[in-house]
Every structure is written in C-alpha cells, then in structure tokens.
Amino acid sequence: MTESTFSQYPRLVLSKGREKSLLRRHPWVFSGAVSRLEGKANLGETIDIVDHQGKWLARGAWSPASQIRARVWTFDKAESIDIAFFTRRLRQAQQWRDWLAKKDGLDSYRLIAGESDGLPGVTIDRFGHFLVLQLLSAGAEYQRAALISALQTCYPDCAIYDRSDVAVRKKEGMALTQGPVTGELPPALLPIEEHGMKLLVDIQGGHKTGYYLDQRDSRLATRRYVENQRVLNCFSYTGGFAVSALMGGCRQVVSVDTSQDALDIARQNVELNQLDLSKAEFVRDDVFKLLRAYREHGEKFDVIIMDPPKFVENKSQLMGACRGYKDINMLAIQLLNPGGILLTFSCSGLMTSDLFQKIIADAAIDAGRDVQFIEQFRQAADHPVIATYPEGLYLKGFACRVM
C-alpha cells in the first residue's frame, strides 16, 4: 500500500498537545482533542488521525455525533481496514479463546471484547455454534459486511445472530438492529455448560447477548462460601449464581429479580441440573425495596450475592451511582449474620476498584458493622484488558466477611 493511497483518507487533525493519549496507544479520541476534519467523512468511515503538524498517529473510525469522535482501528500505518484486517484480528482472538476453551472445557465464551481485542465497539459472544454479534460504535456498524465476512472465514460452521439492539447505538446516530445474519435461528432457550452446570440462554430476548459470561469465575468461586448456608441472590437474572450455590451445598437460595421471565428461566436451570427445587425460592421484586422490607421484618442471611446492573453510564452520573452502591451494600451488610459473606460486584466501567472498595467500607460504617475484604474478583479471562485501555477492566467485585 502506497503513501498516496493512504492520503485518500480524510484526516482528523488534533489540537496542539492533544496527541499524548494516542502516543500511549489509547484507542479513543474525544471531541475536546479535535481541531478539525480535513475532507469529508460519513458516519463510521475510516479516517487518518494526525497531530497539529500533520504527523500520522493512527487510523480509526469517524463518529461526529459521539463524545468519542474517533475510535482507533490500528496504530500501524501500513494496515488498511478491510476483510483481511478483521480476519487477522479474529484469528488473534481465536487463538486465546481456543486455548481457554480447551483448558476449561468451555462451549461458550466472549470471542471479541471490543477495544481490548483491537476491534472497538465490537462484542461477539460464542454460545455453542452460535456467534452473537453486537456492534456498538459507528465504525463497527460501517464495517459490518467486512466483519461478517471475516467471521464466516474463521467460523464457517457457526450461525451468526445480531443483537445490536442496545440503546448506546443511539448516541452515535444509529438505529437498533436484531435478527439472524447467517445460518439458523437460535432456539428460544439454548443449553450451555459452565463449570459443571447446564444453563439455558435466551439469545434472542435475554440481556445483552443472552448471558453474562464475564461472571463465570465468580459464580464458581461462590461455591466455597455457601455450604449449609442461607443465600440471598440479588439481581439474579437467569439464576447462574443460584445454580452454583445449590451445587455448592447451600441450605437455601432466594433469588430476586424484577423480571418474571428471567426468574422462570432460573427455575428451569435449577430443574435442568436436577437440584433440589425445594431449596430454591424465586422472588419478583425490586431489590432495594425488598432489602428494606427484609430488614424491617428481621430476616437474616449467611451469604448475600449483590450483582446489580450498571448504575453509571457517564461521569455526570458517578456520584449518584456511588450513593446507589453504598445504599444497597449497606442494606446487605445489615441483613448478614455475624461472620456472613457479602459477594458484591460493580460492572460500571467508570467505577474503579479502589472507589468501589471505599464505597463498601463506607457502607459498612453506615451499617455499624466491621467488614474484612477476603477476596477480589474481576471479569473472566475471555474478557481481557489491553494494557493501554484500563477502561476495559469494567467488572470488579469483592468477597467481604461481615463481623
């Protein structure tokens, strides 16, 4: 590829002194760093990013409606963005996931974790022979055809299903899309296996791509704390933690969620694993309200699992999210018997591990209890975090012993 060919790309010129993050290979360019766009670029189209003197820095995708004006595809000037590019990225990701799948006996895993796999705005989860695709950025959508072609090359025997029906697409001026791309339609509930559990996944209608694969290791870790214990499983979704708790020998597990459909699948998951259904209770309720009601009625638990949805989407919401996390963890701490275990998580990328730990400490003070941090959690290894993109470490959690 010649330099003259590269010059055909529109150029995004950065303001003076705003190239430092790109020199450190961070994959985002924020609106405040942009001086001007030279040439015309459509939504999601490939552009070259240069400093204020015209020095080439990266090649990325243009998104004029987003606070993230450009997401970097490559820091290699010789690399063009085409089917071969996406095939290379997929092969790199495939190598790691194939090793993990063989090592841990996985039939389902995250194949592409966005920026950390060099494909910003692209999420791909594999469930058996189904690949579930989410395109979350303008650049990813613009390259849809090339990406799907690369997927078919790397996974010729897999069906592809699109779950790009997430609200974040609206921020970049894109419509929501969902439906089969290639191959057959996924069944209403697809069985997968995870650490000895059989679990039903709703690819077409479930949260995100159908199941939270990132919590795989945390669900397994739960088993060491639950033998003969009474467990409260908050924001239970389809019951992965509940099934794991029952496999760990818990005395009872109460699963709470606002979705009756999710609770119905959770019940089916307990039955599918031939576990004692009499030890499992399913409650459709708002977790905040129910915890306060439990406190009022003197309910107590030995283990509480707190795995809420994302409380914060942007920095302006961070303070409110901190209050929400503090309130809900304070309530959980108050409901635990002395020596009880709180397994608490945050999936908000803007919530750092240090800040989350401080929130738990503050919640313990407000609850009037002493808390020991005994274990730390993060997303499973099929959700890697590239060193230049710390935002990729979005899931964090702690096991806490409440005195």
From Swiss-Prot:
Pfam families: Methyltrans_SAM, PUA_3. It is found in: Cytoplasm. It catalyses: cytidine(1962) in 23S rRNA + S-adenosyl-L-methionine = 5-methylcytidine(1962) in 23S rRNA + S-adenosyl-L-homocysteine + H(+). It comes from Salmonella schwarzengrund (strain CVM19633). CDD domains: AdoMet_MTases, PUA_RlmI, RlmI_M_like. This is Ribosomal RNA large subunit methyltransferase I. InterPro entries: PUA, PUA-like_sf, PUA_sf, RLMI, RlmI-like_PUA, SAM-dep_methyl-trfase, SAM-dependent_MTases_sf. Residues 9-88 form the PUA domain. The gene is rlmI. Its main location: cytoplasm. One of its GO terms (molecular function) is rRNA (cytosine) methyltransferase activity. It comes from the Bacteria.
